[in-house]
């Protein structure tokens, strides 16, 4: 276990006065329970740094007071909601963990204006369950239904299965209540004018770009305590969906309306796969569009069987032939709309020499349908080895995304061959097009590994840098691997010096550096001092032995 700094008596006493004795602790056993999360850790340690204390506020006013106490005593703090991955935890020693689990209310569901007002600890599955009672649905990012709805739209990034209909995570916040890094309160959009929560912009220039940009500040720029999020029509779905079991053992006790179906589409090439995506977007149809990964499918549902199948050359080749797979779903408002959309997708598939399987004829239809809409399957990426990382994933026109998938597959194969990653035939690319007609989206290259094999730590990091080198060399855009620790020092000068603007925002909003910025960016003065010392850990020659890289 890492050594830990414990908060001193005076600030602890002041925080205790705000929260009460039962809602703050510096007991090492309690603090240890917040350090368990190794996923996407900045270091290669199995634990993240243990917090100096854990505080559990219940109101915005209590959050403000905690933040002001931290500023007064020059203590850093980090807020988390549901705590998926290490972004919500401290990135260094001596940080107070603000655990927002007591702020867990769905305050309002506005059926007419189609939005919900939530606090930080409301997870996506909770909001979806309540929204469905009103014939509505929410966007759930690929990380799964366990994630915080507020955190995913204010502080991180993400796309979910329904992104063609419900958009990208960062496009879903409306009015926001924001405790700034110094403890002052700022309401963004209409709540700032006392006009409700239906809009996140104005009057005047919007602050949403400063608040989150593309990737969010991951807790490095204060604390978000309330947020209105968009809701979307979810036509003809029962208000409650009874079932038994969980995940792959799900046994539904309901029947879907005939206006809902999902399909497997198999194409002969990436070119046909891409053309189908563009045609779907141009036709303005669909509720789900996403690449299916046959290599990962067996790993998620049956990891032991996958090892046997992939060790059999004949079976491996058969499975590989289904690589160019699209998952597509329709949710029609009426019988006529459903019939129209199904007619269109059949024509698109035929014109691109592809085949389509109607999953409604299979006994697993309801279970798989629910797994997609609930976004439960991505969480199963932990099954084969207990951990994974992701790379590529630039949000670009879909043809560029497919190019990332091709290159990412070749790079990942090298690291499968050397034992870094679990063999999934290098086919674990996930993503789709966003927002219907836009035809932009992302495809990220997910790599699963066994954390019990520590000797792969170095090559895992090397892989992330290799994929980033590829995005630079081939002008593929700013991908998910570009968000890793200190990548802004590399990518910033290549992209309009965005890192300088971000660090100036950090310094202006957080002059004391109180909001832990380990997963964000340091203040401008600190950043400038460190820029000259930065050396890339991995050089571009890491790509030299990637087979057929330029094909």
Which role does the model predict for each range below?
Residues 14, 18-42:
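Conserved oxyanion/phosphate-binding beta-strand-loop segments in alpha/beta enzyme cores
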Residues 212, 228, 239-248, 257-268, ...:
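C-terminal cap/substrate-recognition region of VAO/PCMH-type FAD-linked oxidoreductases
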Residues 241-243, 253-268, 324-326, 382-405:
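Short glycine-/aliphatic-rich beta-strand segments at the starts of folded cytosolic domains
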């Amino acid at each position: 276990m890492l050594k830990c700094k414990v908060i001193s008596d005076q600030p602890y006493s002041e925080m205790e006065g705000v929260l009460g004795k039962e809602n703050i602790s510096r007991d090492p056993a309690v603090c240890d329970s917040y350090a368990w999360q190794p996923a996407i850790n900045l270091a290669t340690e199995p634990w993240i740094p243990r917090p100096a204390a854990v505080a559990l506020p219940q109101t915005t006013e209590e959050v403000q007071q905690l933040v002001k106490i931290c500023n007064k005593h020059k203590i850093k703090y980090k807020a988390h909601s549901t705590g998926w991955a290490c972004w919500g935890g401290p990135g260094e020693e001596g940080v107070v963990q603000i655990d927002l689990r007591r702020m867990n209310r769905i305050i309002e569901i506005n059926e007419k204006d189609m939005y919900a007002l939530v606090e930080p600890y409301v997870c996506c599955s909770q909001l979806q369950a309540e929204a469905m009672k009103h014939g509505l649905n929410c966007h759930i990012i690929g990380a799964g239904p366990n994630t915080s709805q507020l955190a995913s739209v204010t502080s991180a990034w993400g796309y979910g299965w329904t992104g063609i209909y419900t958009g990208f995570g960062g496009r879903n916040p409306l009015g926001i209540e924001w405790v700034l890094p110094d403890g002052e309160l700022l309401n963004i959009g209409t709540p700032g004018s006392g006009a409700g929560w239906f809009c996140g912009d104005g009057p005047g220039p919007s602050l949403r770009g400063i608040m989150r940009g593309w990737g969010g500040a991951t807790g490095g720029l204060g604390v978000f305590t309330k947020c209105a999020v968009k809701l979307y029509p979810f036509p003809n779905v029962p208000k409650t969906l009874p079932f038994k079991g969980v995940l792959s053992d799900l046994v539904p006790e309901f029947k879907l309306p005939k206006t809902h179906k999902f399909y497997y589409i198999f194409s002969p090439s990436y070119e046909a796969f891409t053309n189908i995506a563009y045609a779907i977007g141009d036709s303005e149809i669909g509720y789900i569009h996403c690449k299916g990964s046959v290599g990962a499918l067996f790993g998620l549902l049956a990891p032991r069987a996958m090892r046997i199948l992939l060790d059999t050359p004949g079976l491996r080749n058969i499975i590989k032939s289904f690589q160019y797979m699209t998952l597509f779903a329709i949710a029609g408002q009426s019988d006529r709309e459903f019939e129209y959309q199904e007619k269109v997708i059949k024509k698109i598939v035929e014109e691109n020499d592809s085949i389509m399987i109607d999953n409604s004829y299979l006994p697993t239809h309801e279970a798989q349908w629910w797994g997609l809409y609930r976004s439960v399957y991505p969480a199963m990426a932990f099954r084969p080895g207990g951990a994974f990382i992701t790379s590529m994933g630039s949000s670009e026109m879909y043809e560029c995304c497919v190019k990332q998938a091709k290159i990412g597959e070749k790079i990942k194969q090298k690291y499968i061959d050397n034992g870094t990653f679990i063999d999934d035939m290098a086919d674990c690319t996930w993503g789709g097009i966003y927002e219907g007609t836009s035809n932009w989206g992302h495809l990220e290259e997910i790599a699963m590994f066994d954390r019990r094999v520590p000797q792969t730590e170095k090559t895992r990091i090397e892989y992330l840098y290799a994929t980033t080198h590829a995005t630079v060399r081939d002008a593929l855009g700013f991908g998910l691997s570009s968000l890793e620790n200190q990548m802004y020092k590399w990518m910033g000068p290549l992209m309009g010096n965005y890192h300088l603007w971000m660090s100036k925002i950090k310094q202006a909003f957080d002059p004391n550096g109180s909001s832990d910025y380990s997963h964000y960016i340091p203040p401008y003065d600190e950043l400038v001092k460190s820029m000259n010392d930065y050396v890339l850990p991995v050089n571009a020659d890491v790509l030299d032995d990637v087979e057929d890289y330029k094909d």
